[in-house]
Amino acid sequence: MAIRKSQVYLSTVNSYLIDSPQPSTINYWYNTGSLTGLCLVIQIASGIFTAMHYSSHIDLAFASVEHIMRDVNYGYLIRYIHANGASFFFVCMYGHIGKALYYGSYKSPRVLVWVIGVIIFITTMATAFTGYCCVYGQMSHWGATVITNTLSAIPFIGNDLVPFIWGSFSVSNPTIQRFFALHYLCPFILAALVVMHLMALHVHGSTNPLGISSNIDRLPFHGYFVFKDLVTVFVFLLIFSTFVFFSPNTLGHPDNYIPGNPLVTPASIVPEWYTLPFYAILRSIPDKLGGVIAMFGSILITLVLPVTDRSVIKGNTFKIFSKTLYFTFTYNFILLGQLGQLHVEVPFIEMGQIATFNYFTYFIVLVPLVSTLENILFYIGRVTTK
């Protein structure tokens, strides 16, 4: 027997990365998972080297970032890789989530994979938020102030919870230091969650675009899908390198090159682009508590999909109504992202409220309604063809 199969640790690697049977019909959208894993490795590696030269003291945080950029050998490269890596991490993650929504990867028997994936997404958002605050530029300070202040809407404990998180009566030195500690810790929690995600996936294997059982036609992972993944890895590295070397600040905000000043409020407080859809949902609800519930609910509501999607056919490949609904939802999500960076004024307020209503309607009403309708049409078609 080959050593990769007989040795305890190598046999585990073999079962996941070499002999793992994969559906022969999976397409390039399934590569977003491996790209997201690559981004996590890049972020952990670049983050460790950045942390070697970073100071989390509020008086030194901004200066230490400039020190990394100007004085550390290749510090500018490490910092730009880490900053742009965060954006590309979310690009790949949103693509991975979009693939799962389109191909029905959340349906039984892969519900656990989906639930762990949602937990990974929430943890990633927390990691990104705490990291964004560590720079302590003007947008970092006010972003931290606004987002943490939303927790004051929680009944009974909200007003005590916010100073507890800050460690003071405002965003100050204890806040930045504890945010940095959490930011350093969270990626390793993410890595553990990713391992759990892969373990849950390994039980039943990947889905496929056809939405049918692929047990009769599978191929080993190594040799076929390793090289298929490498194609998108090289394309990803090409695009990623273009941003890092030629346009490193495109995905950032210019106000964050101004040191954080609690006495000067920016013209508009805009978080990082990957949080904008949820920020738009937060702003669309006039009531503060309602906005906070809607923002967190917009992520947690994805957990109901395995229940609300009643379709007997996995995925949207052969379902025209679900496919149309999916692309409408995608457009609505992008619209929320655009509205999140605009000023709170007419007509953007009303547009945000309509887009927020459409977002929740998709999960609660449209998915069960359309999937039930398609089931009826499917059964009618099956009876008439007999």
UniProtKB/Swiss-Prot annotation:
Keyword terms: Electron transport, Heme, Iron, Membrane, Metal-binding, Mitochondrion, Mitochondrion inner membrane, Respiratory chain, Transmembrane, Transmembrane helix, Transport, Ubiquinone
Keyword rRNA-binding: no
GO biological process: mitochondrial electron transport, ubiquinol to cytochrome c
Cofactor note (record): Binds 2 heme b groups non-covalently.
Binding site for heme b b566: 96, 197
Pfam families reported for this sequence: Cytochrom_B_C, Cytochrome_B
Cofactor(s), names only, from the UniProt record: heme b
Residues engaged in binding a ubiquinone: 202
CDD domains per UniProt: cytochrome_b_C, Cytochrome_b_N
InterPro entries (UniProt xref): Cyt_b/b6_C, Cyt_b/b6_C_sf, Cyt_b/b6_N, Cytb/b6-like_sf, Cytochrome_b, Cytochrome_b_C_euk/bac, Cytochrome_b_N_euk/bac, Di-haem_cyt_TM
Bilayer-spanning residue ranges: 32-52, 76-98, 113-133, 179-199, 225-245, 289-309, 321-341, 348-368
Binding site for heme b b562: 82, 183
Annotated GO MF terms: metal ion binding; ubiquinol-cytochrome-c reductase activity
Gene3D superfamilies: Cytochrome Bc1 Complex, Chain C (1.20.810.10)
Entry function: Component of the ubiquinol-cytochrome c reductase complex (complex III or cytochrome b-c1 complex) that is part of the mitochondrial respiratory chain. The b-c1 complex mediates electron transfer from ubiquinol to cytochrome c. Contributes to the generation of a proton gradient across the mitochondrial membrane that is then used for ATP synthesis.
Quaternary state and interactors: Fungal cytochrome b-c1 complex contains 10 subunits; 3 respiratory subunits, 2 core proteins and 5 low-molecular weight proteins. Cytochrome b-c1 complex is a homodimer.
UniProt name for this protein: Cytochrome b
